[in-house]
C-alpha cells in the first residue's frame, strides 16, 4: 500500500495556504478559520484533505489566544481522526484550486501600523501580532517604537491624525485618518505592557505624543 505523508495546517484549505494562516485570518477580519489534516504533496499545502474542524473567531481574539485554540483543536483532530485514517475510513477530498488563497512569511514591515489604515484594519493588525511580536507605531520624537497590543474603536474628534493623546487623563486615544482608536494595552521598548491610564501617568506634563506616518519612515532597518 502507498504511504501517504500527512500534515496539519492551520486554515480551512484551500484558503490561506502558506506560512502565516493564523496571523492572516486575523488581518483579514475573518469570523472563522480551522484546522485541516491533509496530504503532503510537492505543491505547498495543496494535498487532499482527510479531516477538518472549524474554529470561530470572536472579535476579542488575538494571535496568542487563536494560536492556543488552533493547537488544542489540532491535537484533538489528530487523536480522533488518525485511527480512522489508518483503518481506511477517511476519504481524501481534493482541494478546489479555483478557491485557493495564499499567505506569506511575516516581516517587520507587516507589523508596523499605518495611520492611513481604516479603523477595522488597524485593529485587526493589532490583533494579528498581539502579544508577540507586537504591532507598532513610531514617535516623531526619537523614533521610539511603541507596541500597540490591544485597542478599540473610539469617537473623539479632538484627537487629530497622528496624535497619541491623553483624554480626560485616563483615556489614551490615537488619531487615524478616518477616526480614532482607544489604546487599551501598550508597551514601550524594554518595558512591560501597561494599560492606557498607566501609560498616561508616565507621560508627565506631556499630553500629546506625535506619531510618524509609516511612509515617512526611513527604511534603514
Stretch-by-stretch model annotation:
Residues 1-102, 109:
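Donor/substrate-binding cores of folate-linked one-carbon enzymes
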Residues 97-221:
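Internal anion-binding site segments
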Amino acid at each position: 500500500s502507498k504511504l501517504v505523508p500527512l500534515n496539519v495546517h492551520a486554515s480551512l484549505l484551500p484558503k490561506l495556504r502558506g506560512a502565516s494562516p493564523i496571523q492572516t485570518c486575523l488581518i483579514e477580519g475573518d469570523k472563522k478559520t480551522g484546522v485541516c489534516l491533509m496530504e503532503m504533496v510537492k505543491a505547498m499545502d495543496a494535498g487532499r484533505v482527510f479531516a477538518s474542524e472549524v474554529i470561530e473567531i470572536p472579535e476579542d481574539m488575538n494571535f496568542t489566544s487563536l494560536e492556543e485554540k488552533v493547537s488544542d483543536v489540532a491535537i484533538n483532530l489528530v487523536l480522533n481522526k488518525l485511527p480512522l485514517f489508518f483503518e481506511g475510513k477517511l476519504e481524501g477530498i481534493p482541494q478546489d484550486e479555483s478557491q485557493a488563497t495564499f499567505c506569506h512569511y511575516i516581516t517587520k514591515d507587516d507589523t508596523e501600523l499605518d495611520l492611513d489604515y481604516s479603523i477595522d484594519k488597524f485593529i485587526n493588525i493589532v490583533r494579528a501580532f498581539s502579544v508577540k511580536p507586537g504591532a507598532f507605531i513610531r514617535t516623531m520624537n526619537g523614533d521610539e517604537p511603541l507596541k500597540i497590543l490591544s485597542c478599540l474603536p473610539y469617537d473623539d474628534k479632538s484627537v487629530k491624525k497622528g496624535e497619541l493623546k491623553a483624554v480626560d487623563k485616563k483615556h489614551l486615544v490615537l488619531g487615524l485618518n478616518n477616526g480614532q482608536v482607544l489604546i487599551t494595552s501598550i508597551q514601550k521598548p524594554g518595558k512591560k505592557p501597561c494599560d492606557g491610564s498607566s501609560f498616561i501617568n508616565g507621560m508627565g506634563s506631556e499630553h500629546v505624543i506625535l506619531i510618524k506616518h509609516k511612509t515617512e519612515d526611513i527604511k534603514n532597518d
